């Protein structure tokens, strides 16, 4: 068959399939109903705990809610500090009000009906589900561009089995991570919509929006810009127009979002960990370079590659020379001590090799899963089974693979990005099995379902953990009879996160609490107290002093308490299977204050005042302490 005949035949087949799909397509309302129903069923207990007890999964969610409350109470748009953290200076934060905005709007709208407190909880349930629905709608649109025969229900099936990523959309997950996932797929959809001027322009705008919200996606955006340049080098369809439109979107994003994110007086201030003149300069240089490449009429690929490399290297070099303090990345300002003792202990900030060496080789399963799907996608495009629209999807998969060696959390994004390839393979399997003469439809469905099991990521994790069980520590196993009463309750979190955990502390006169790091934000939400610290890197001295207090010996801990002058000390007991050993350069673990608190051997200058059955141990500082 000649290429022209193949193209006509393929176009005819696509149009026929598209007509058939449109005829049986479920309505968006029906899809929305099933997604919301899934959320209610899968997260029934977390939703119940959120509405009845204000429970959320992560300290960042509590601090986000506290930020929203502060803003609604009159704190300025540009002022995202936390006055009740690390007093008297206040907690310095790099967060964005852009995430606070929809949560605050929902809270205000619901307050007349439910009251302020319940309105905030309902808003915390609605917002993640809304972001999930938008993410799934974007994924469906991506799959339809890559494979016109897409069944939306199949997209939802593969997406909702990505348990690791789905946890970011659970009720109460109101911090920015789920929005960042959504923005990645909006960028991808824009790149796949090259024939529409809004596609690449929207992708460029979303790059800046993502950076304005947080720098989580910074490495991804850098590699995505590199992919766009490579598409121009190899003269892919609409690549030139894509560069120009992406540049326009970036410029528009900078013009709109930078003034919304940074007050005029700080436009020239250098901040390595948030949108600042550093990243504005880098993105503006990239946009200028893209615009220049778009007008270059070089036909030689080697020349194109050299020019694209010059643009990329030039933007990086100029930024590095102009802002040397940020050459080490967003966390350049952190001290070596804070990086070694605190940042390095954040598991998701580690690469896959380090993560797997600590938690077991079974964690390589998702890496292998994505590699195989990437290879399958390349074969589909090379054999023209799938169109070139799949190429941006494969680029995102490759980017996630590269980033996983820096941060393991890139894999959960990669599993989401692999959904279009899974949809295509599942559809091809159905067509193969249903085309066999004499085979019943039920048998074809069974064979397709069996094949689809290998495309579902949790199956890989289950098998990998069965073959390569994670390293265990016999000391980690708690005897049921020895476990405290609070730990026997259903759905107990790894952190203190219910209002009942803080009910006693809330009755005490307001004062400064020297707290374990994970508990600080919840104390701000559930009580009127101030806290010394939370896991927020700009407050490095407070973080280290808190770690030293609980991990050091009595003499060192007392010096810290004397310097900080707290009225209370609060320590959330960890789950019996997760007794901590906080890294510290001072003192020994066995005689640390944290260990002694857990063993009931606290020093005399700490007077236990909370009920013995409470999970949150609350102590009053003795008058001479």
Go through the PLM ranges and name each one.
Residues 308-313, 430-470:
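Signature aromatic-anchored transmembrane alpha helix within multi-pass, membrane-resident enzymes
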Residues 7-15, 457-625:
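Extracytoplasmic
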Residues 44-145, 151-158, 162-183, 210:
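Active-site lumenal/periplasmic loops and adjacent helix-entry segments of GT-C-fold
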Residues 236-244, 298-308, 324, 367-395:
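Membrane-interface helix-loop-helix junctions at transmembrane boundaries of multi-pass membrane enzymes
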Residues 84, 110-117, 260-274, 331-364:
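Juxtamembrane membrane-water interface segments that cap and precede transmembrane helices
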Residues 34-42, 127-145, 151-195, 199-233, ...:
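Membrane-embedded helix bundles of polyisoprenyl
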Residues 1-48, 153, 295-312:
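Start-transfer (signal-anchor) and selected internal transmembrane alpha helices
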Residues 22-61, 66, 73, 80-83, ...:
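Transmembrane signal-anchor helices characteristic of membrane glycosylation enzymes that use polyprenol
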């Amino acid at each position: 068959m000649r290429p022209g005949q193949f193209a006509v035949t393929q176009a005819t087949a696509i149009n026929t399939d598209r007509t058939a799909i449109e005829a049986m397509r479920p309505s968006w309302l029906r899809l929305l109903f099933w997604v919301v129903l899934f959320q209610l069923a899968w997260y029934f207990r977390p939703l119940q705990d959120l509405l009845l007890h204000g429970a959320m999964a992560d300290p960042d969610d509590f601090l986000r809610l506290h930020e929203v409350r502060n803003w609604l109470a009159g704190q300025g748009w540009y002022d995202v500090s936390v006055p009740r953290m690390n007093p008297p200076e206040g907690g310095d934060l790099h967060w964005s009000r852009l995430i606070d905005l929809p949560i605050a709007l929902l809270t205000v709208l619901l307050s007349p009906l439910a009251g302020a407190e319940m309105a905030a909880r309902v808003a915390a349930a609605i917002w993640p589900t809304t972001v999930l629905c938008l993410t799934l709608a974007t994924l469906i649109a991506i799959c339809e561009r890559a494979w016109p025969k897409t069944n939306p229900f199949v997209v939802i099936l593969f997406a909702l089995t990505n348990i690791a990523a789905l946890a970011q959309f659970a009720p109460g997950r109101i911090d920015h991570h789920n929005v960042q996932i959504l923005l990645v797929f909006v960028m991808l959809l824009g790149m796949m919509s090259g024939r529409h001027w809004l596609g690449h322009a929207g992708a460029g705008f979303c790059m800046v929006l993502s950076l304005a919200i947080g720098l989580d996606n910074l490495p991804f955006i850098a590699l995505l810009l590199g992919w766009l340049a490579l598409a121009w080098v190899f003269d892919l369809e609409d690549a030139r127009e894509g560069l120009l439109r992406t540049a326009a979107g970036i410029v528009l994003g900078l013009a709109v979002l930078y003034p919304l994110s940074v007050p005029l007086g700080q436009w020239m201030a250098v901040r390595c960990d948030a949108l600042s003149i550093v990243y504005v300069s880098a993105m503006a240089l990239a946009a200028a370079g893209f615009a220049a490449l778009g007008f270059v009429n070089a036909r030689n690929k080697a020349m194109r590659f050299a020019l694209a490399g010059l643009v990329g290297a030039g933007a990086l070099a100029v930024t590095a020379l102009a802002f040397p303090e940020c050459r080490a990345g967003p966390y350049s300002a952190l001290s070596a001590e804070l990086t070694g003792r605190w940042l390095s202990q954040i598991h998701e900030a580690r690469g896959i090799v380090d993560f797997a060496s600590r938690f077991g080789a079974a964690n390589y399963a998702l890496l292998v899963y994505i590699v195989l799907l990437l290879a399958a996608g390349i074969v589909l495009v090379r054999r023209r089974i799938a169109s070139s629209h799949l190429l941006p999807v494969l680029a995102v998969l490759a980017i996630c693979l590269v980033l996983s060696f820096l941060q393991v959390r890139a894999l959960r994004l990669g599993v989401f990005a692999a959904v279009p390839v899974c949809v295509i393979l599942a559809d091809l399997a159905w067509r193969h099995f249903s085309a066999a003469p004499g085979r019943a439809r039920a048998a074809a469905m069974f064979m397709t379902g069996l094949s689809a099991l290998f495309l579902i990521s949790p199956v890989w994790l289950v098998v990998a953990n069965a073959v390569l069980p994670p390293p265990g520590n016999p000391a980690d196993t708690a005897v049921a009879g020895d476990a405290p009463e609070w730990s026997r309750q259903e759905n107990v979190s790894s952190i203190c996160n219910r209002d009942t955990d803080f009910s006693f502390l809330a009755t005490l006169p307001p004062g400064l609490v020297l707290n374990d790091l994970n508990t600080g934000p919840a104390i701000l939400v559930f009580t009127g107290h101030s806290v010394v610290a939370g896991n927020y890197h700009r407050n490095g001295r407070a973080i280290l002093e808190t770690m030293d207090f609980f991990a050091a010996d009595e003499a060192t801990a007392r010096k810290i308490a004397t310097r900080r002058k707290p009225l209370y000390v609060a320590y959330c007991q960890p789950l019996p299977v997760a007794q901590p050993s906080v890294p510290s350069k001072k003192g020994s673990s066995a005689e640390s204050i944290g260990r002694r608190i857990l063993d009931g051997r606290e020093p005399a200058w700490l007077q236990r005042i909370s009920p013995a059955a409470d999970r949150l141990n609350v102590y009053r500082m003795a008058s001479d302490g």
